[in-house]
Amino acid sequence: MNTDKEIKRIALEMCPNYCYGTPYYLNTRTDRMRRDRQLPACLHIQTSEGSESTTATPYWQTDVRTRRVQVGFADAIKFDDDPEKTLEKVEELLSMCRELIKRMNASNLWARINEFSYNVLYNTQDGNLVWVLMDFNATELPRNCED
């Protein structure tokens, strides 16, 4: 299986009641947020410590030309709230990314990654969203893979 598709599969396993095919994503031409369909109000996240509920949504994007994969989680947040709440939300998304890395390691996917970084993105124009994204350079990402 392609590295990017395997990473996406693991991210979706963490969100068993996630409605497949409706991730948040950035349109690279307009750099604006959009959604295909209505997303579930709450996701049930399975972690190694147990399960918990969250409103976070999986996100991914594959750039076939550069062989980079972005995967992570997005969530709506009110930026006029207490800054501590914003930090708590970012930490929640980071913990979900850490869980994803654990699962990637268990699936021997980490060996296929030769470059890695975290990005925290905020979007106040399109509904007050925060993303925590992991940016990978996947060595085995074929030139003809699909998003």
PLM features: what roles do these ranges have?
Residues 15-21, 37-38, 42-44, 90-139:
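Acidic-leaning, charged glycine-interspersed low-complexity segments
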Residues 57, 83-86, 122:
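Residues at structural and domain junctions
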Residues 56-68, 97-98:
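Phosphate-binding glycine-rich loops and adjacent basic patches that engage nucleotide phosphates
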